[in-house]
């Protein structure tokens, strides 16, 4: 399958920027709809990237955007919602379930067979959190279209890299406060680098062997949340005291943070952590999957202004 033009939904976000760059580097024309074009200046100057101001909330708008495209990539997702509703809130339903429904229908109307979709490791209709339940239902909708469309789903663990809201958030707090209250420190993750995720998407685009597959995207090592916070503290040279919270106190803290205009954490995030975001030998990995170690990348953007970070960055660039 020869892919020359791609519609990238959610392309102005963290992972989308990496994928857009990879596509652009390969000479593929990329269309990234956005509501506020002025906020995406770094992408606008990329060659082969077009960013029309379009609201994608209607099937008709999606069909129009898909005209002349060879493939669609959907990365749209949210981490927080202001409502608590079973099985999930209106916000989660719209982003993770209703939008994939519209995308599938629009692909069929526009005659675009190739669809790649972002789910999440642990996504399932039976998962403990609204986020994972809605992601699971959205994934099922996309996978059910296989046959009429050529679909591939990706299910990453937590994604790290320059511009993330994961290690960078830890680093910001550790630099500012003398203590770090940490709940669910036992939760396990298998962090994967955003550039590796981008490569998985781009390498799969024209590969018929990936049609109908749901791939798990994980890094080479499993960490507890406490280990990741400790490592980030080491990178930034923080002496902050890390205080382990009981489950009750963790949910109280998350509830208070959830009330802020831009929450860093919510009770639903903690419920997601009840399921380890790891692959314990039951993975469906992409062919030739060789993920990059977190320790090779994190110092290049977390500790770049510390002596240790500068040395680690030099070693990484030098291939040492």
How should these model regions be labeled?
Residues 172-192, 196, 200-216:
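A conserved pocket-lining segment of Rossmann-fold NAD(P)-dependent short-chain dehydrogenase/reductase
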Residues 127-129, 154-169, 223:
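Flexible, glycine-rich beta-alpha linker
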Residues 248-320:
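A hydrophobic C-terminal alpha-helical subdomain
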Residues 38-109, 121-125:
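NAD(P)H-binding glycine-rich loop region in Rossmannoid oxidoreductase-like domains
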Residues 29, 78, 89-152, 157:
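Conserved Rossmann-fold NAD(P)-dependent oxidoreductase catalytic core, especially the SDR/UDP-sugar
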Residues 188-195, 217-235, 244-254, 290-293:
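Substrate-binding strand-loop-helix patch
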Residues 28-36:
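Conserved glycine-rich Rossmann-like NAD(P)H-binding loop of the short-chain dehydrogenase/reductase
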Residues 3-26:
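N-terminal Rossmann NAD(P)H-binding glycine-rich loop of SDR-like oxidoreductase domains
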């Amino acid at each position: 399958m020869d892919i020359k033009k791609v519609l990238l939904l959610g392309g102005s976000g963290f992972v989308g920027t990496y994928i857009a760059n990879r596509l652009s580097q390969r000479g593929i024309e990329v269309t990234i709809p956005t509501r506020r074009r002025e906020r995406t200046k770094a992408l606008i100057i990329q060659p082969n990237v077009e960013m029309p101001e379009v609201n994608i909330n209607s099937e008709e708008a999606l069909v129009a955007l898909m005209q002349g495209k060879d493939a669609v990539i959907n990365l749209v997702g949210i981490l927080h919602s202001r409502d608590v509703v079973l099985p999930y809130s209106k916000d989660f339903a719209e982003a993770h379930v209703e939008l994939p429904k519209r995308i599938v229908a629009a692909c069929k109307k526009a005659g675009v067979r190739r669809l790649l979709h972002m789910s999440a490791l642990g996504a399932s209709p039976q998962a403990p959190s609204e986020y994972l339940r809605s992601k699971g239902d959205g994934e099922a909708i996309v996978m059910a279209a296989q046959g009429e469309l050529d679909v591939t789903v990706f299910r990453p663990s937590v994604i790290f890299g320059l511009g993330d809201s994961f290690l960078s958030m830890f680093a910001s707090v550790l630099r500012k406060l003398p203590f770090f209250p940490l709940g669910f420190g036992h939760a396990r993750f298998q962090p994967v680098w955003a550039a590796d995720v981008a490569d998985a998407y781009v390498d799969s685009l024209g590969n018929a062997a990936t049609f109908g597959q749901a791939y798990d995207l994980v890094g080479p090592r499993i960490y507890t949340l406490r280990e990741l916070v400790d490592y980030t503290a080491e990178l930034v040279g923080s002496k902050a005291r890390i205080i382990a919270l009981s489950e009750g106190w963790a949910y109280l803290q998350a509830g208070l943070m959830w009330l802020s205009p831009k929450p860093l954490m919510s009770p639903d995030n903690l419920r997601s952590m009840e399921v380890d975001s790891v692959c314990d030998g039951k993975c469906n990995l992409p062919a030739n999957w060789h993920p990059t170690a977190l320790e090779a990348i994190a110092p290049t953007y977390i500790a770049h202004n510390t002596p240790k970070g500068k040395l680690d960055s030099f070693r990484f660039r030098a291939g040492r």
